[in-house]
């Protein structure tokens, strides 16, 4: 089973100078604290968010999984 690579997502977001608030808005989430729960592993990213996340982070979907 594939797992979301949370370390990669956080690292890549920071490399691109994207804030958690910006990620939340781009993904259609209600708040940056909501996004924070996903990035810290307290909530699971849903499959439908992954294509948009790959686009925002300028990477392939495969990079988002371990």
Question: What name fits each language-model region?
Answer:
Residues 17-37:
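Short alpha-helical DNA-recognition segment
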Residues 13, 24, 54:
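The alpha-helix within a helix-turn-helix
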Residues 1-15:
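A short, Lys/Arg-rich alpha-helix, primarily the initiator
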């Amino acid at each position: 089973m594939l797992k979301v690579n949370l370390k990669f997502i956080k690292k890549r977001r920071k490399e691109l100078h994207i804030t958690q608030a910006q990620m939340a808005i781009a993904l259609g989430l209600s708040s940056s604290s909501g996004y924070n729960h996903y990035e810290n592993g307290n909530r699971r990213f849903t499959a439908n968010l992954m294509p948009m996340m790959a686009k925002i982070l300028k990477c392939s979907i495969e990079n988002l999984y371990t």
